[in-house]
Curated annotation (Swiss-Prot):
GO CC list: cytoplasm
Listed name of the protein: 4-hydroxythreonine-4-phosphate dehydrogenase
Gene name for this UniProt entry: pdxA
Similarity-based family: Belongs to the PdxA family.
Pathway info: Cofactor biosynthesis; pyridoxine 5'-phosphate biosynthesis; pyridoxine 5'-phosphate from D-erythrose 4-phosphate: step 4/5
Textual note on the cofactor: Binds 1 divalent metal cation per subunit. Can use ions such as Zn(2+), Mg(2+) or Co(2+).
Amino acid sequence: MTLRIAITPGEPAGIGPDLLLKLAQQTWDAQLVAIADANMLKQRAKHLGLSIKLIEFDQHAAATPAPAGSLYLHQVDVAEPVELGVLNDANGQYVLDTLRIASEKNMDGTFAAVVTGPVHKGIINKAGISFSGHTEYFAQQSNTADVVMMLATQGLRVALVTTHIPLAYVSRAITEDRLIKVASILNHDLQTKFGIEKPRILVCGLNPHAGEDGHLGREEIDTIIPTLEILNNQGMNLIGPLPADTLFQDKYLNEADAVLAMYHDQGLPVLKYKGFGNSVNITLGLPFIRTSVDHGTALDLAGKGTADVGSFELAIREAIKLAQEKAQNQ
């Protein structure tokens, strides 16, 4: 059975369309369907010197992979013509429309997964649309109360307790309820999506030296340690809280299936240093599979043909792999 994978290229003025067009030059063992504007893709392909044949997507037809140099397309119109590297808030709604369609078509079973290209949160908000990120948007669209953002590269998976919030708000956001929900989703999806029977998860402390017995902060003593005890008593295998400045060593990571970091810039700098351009963003807890790139829109590289396809390619391959495993287990 050929699986259908939805792809949203992201911000039209950035490198997302470039990367998708490059990757469409090869064959895939799934039907890749771009949810995007045809004219925008054709103009970008011409600018890059790439040949592309766009095939109108018919969800009622049998799913077949596109030949190299071709791409199935679900049309969504941009509001205004796209200028390379120049943000235009008039096209903010276009970006959200591509995400909404991807979400709806994954929810109704048309697609087996969605792969998202990089978006520019600022320009979407400038258009008057509240948007904090893909993870939160897909959770809202699918009526999912709690989701977890996890990035993965070779030998390292990092999930986050908090995501796109100011650093000043992190401490108050780390509650027993939040920790239980995030750790439970992470543990469950490592078992069901990645086939890890009993995941071993390393948990970062919030404060320097994991609080150093309360001398550098009490969040570990008051919240994190008691919550980990509750979860471990339920059968999970959570180790911590551990000092984040020493946790990310091979001698610890080689024995772990994932790291649970308290906030965005605690866990992700290490992962991106280890595998930037070769890592993938995976949203856990959603009723459908969603993967994404590990980088931004790179407006300065749009249309130049020099942007690295590594992370986008990995995101597509990971989505196909997870979708195949899900199909086999159903």
